[in-house]
Amino acid sequence: MIKARIRSQCENSNLGDYEKVYRSFSWEKFSEQLVKDQTGRIDLVGSAIDLWADNPETADQVALIVEKAGEIRRFSYQDLQEISCQWANMLSGLGYCSGDRLFVLLPQGPEIYFAMLACARLGVVFCILHSKADFAQLEACLLNGKPKGILTHPDYLERLPAEALTSVRHFLLTQGPPVATSGHEVVINEIITSLPKRCDPKFHSPKTPLYIVYTSGSTGPPKGVVHSHGDSVGIKASAYYALDLHPGDILWTDGDPGWVTGTVYSSFAPWLCGASSVVQAEPFSASTWYRTLERHKINVWYTSPMILRKLVAAGEDLPGRYDFSKLRHIASVGEPLTPELFFWCRNNLNHPPHDTWWMSETGMILVANFCTMDIKLTSIGRPLPGVETAVVDENGEPLNFLTMGELAVRPNWPAMASGLWQDRERYEDYFRREGWFLTGDMAVTDEDGYIYLQGRNDDLIKVEDKFIGPYEVEQIIARHPSVSEAAVISRTSVEGPVTMKAFVTVHSDIPPSSRLNLEIKAYVKANLSPDIPLKEVEFMDELPKTSTGKLVRRALRAKELGLPAGDTMNMTD
């Protein structure tokens, strides 16, 4: 744990005084801002799109900007209202109604967002599949979700596993002619323009399923996490406080819509706040990312340490060539920020990055370094107003600060997953300690309530009579001037106590050597504790990670045992 404290320089934020807002907060403040009927049912698209489209002062405001293949397309709130109604009318005409499921397998593009809005209007449950998902991943998701339709591109049809398509009645194609003719293809462009641009508002219970997002199961098949229309209350509150979104802001969330961050914070979150969303569909390059920040005058950028590391690798000369004067706030998600990334970002992009924490099951940001709060390096911040967290022991009892336990949340926030699709037992396991949602993340809190993650509960390393989280050891190793990244696991032996093994990648100009191996071990003992049982260091070309940049330590443990890595839903190719 690093004691350094970075003073906040944020002005005119939505949050203001954190302590005051946290004490007096009520979810009702944000619930009242949604479009509802007299029974309390929600019109999510009415709240996110129609509210602005029907107001002459905001109807022409840009809501969605998509940059793809050298072309920039802009859609106003009125455009999205009309297009989403046409898509809803198309789906309704094909027989889709509340509870049906539409899966989406597309590269980044506006059609993903048209489909999300159309489904939300009708109560159809959407699921955005990652465009790079492999055959086995697609098969697992399709067999579990049993969609009525799949929205895709003709080039993707042959990637779909035939055995998993028995429930599918329609293949909705973004262009034609189809590469195969099964009699179930519908070419959207051939029918959409003739459909009405208006549709009647539809209200749904807060408990009506909105979308499914598939995430990896460390010990089983992918989990289909179900979220509902009532999430909109928490989504808006988190975007308002954690991302500090104002009406008219331009937000760029650079996560793929196949991951929950992209699903939530590139669509409904900015629109519920009256902001614009930027979608960059080009492959990553540092110049493309910098150009996007400059060209689209981004005010709020929601990114990840994985992206920041790539920018660091591209060098410090590039940022100075671009104008970031419109950028006001940078937020990060996926893993805790290292001090090195924090200071690089602050020094080269002129703004400190603010960590956020949440997971697919929480549906919204729950913990953040809010822009009005001082930042403590390596801390993910403090709970969002309205969210109660604690670090608890194995019995669910809250622990004192600076004592490691499992991060838990009182299950009263409005975006909590309503279930796991077709898997009630695994869902109920999150609540196995009465009164708490157990996150699986190990953490400690300090005297000011800041939270520090220590790894997943199955990543903990038991040394003599205490548990050690791998994250702190990895951070120390990563500070060695020759090291790029590190991952740490435990090793057991019948001959003696538990020890640690580190997997390390070094900078491109540094050759691995036995001398460096010894140096790293000594560095950890000197900078953390002489009792740390780091017995082995193995150099690797790259570490196994999810596509959002998280280390997959179980893959390293499996490697040590000569076993398969398990489900790879979220791992890179």
Feature roles, as predicted:
Residues 526-551, 567-573:
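AMP-binding/adenylate-forming catalytic domain of the ANL superfamily
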Residues 233-250, 257-300, 314:
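Conserved AMP-binding/adenylation subdomain of ANL enzymes
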Residues 60-117, 134-139, 187-190, 229-230:
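Conserved AMP-binding/adenylate-forming core of the ANL superfamily
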Residues 187-189, 272, 298-303, 313-375, ...:
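Gly/Ser/Thr-rich phosphate-binding loop
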Residues 133, 143, 150-153, 301, ...:
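AMP-binding/adenylate-forming catalytic core of the ANL superfamily
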Residues 74-78, 210-234:
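Conserved AMP-binding A3 loop
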Residues 383-386, 397-430, 466-468:
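Conserved ATP/PPi-binding loop(s) of AMP-dependent carboxylate-activating enzymes
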Residues 60-62, 172, 178, 192-214, ...:
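Conserved pre-ATP/AMP-binding loop-to-beta segment of ANL
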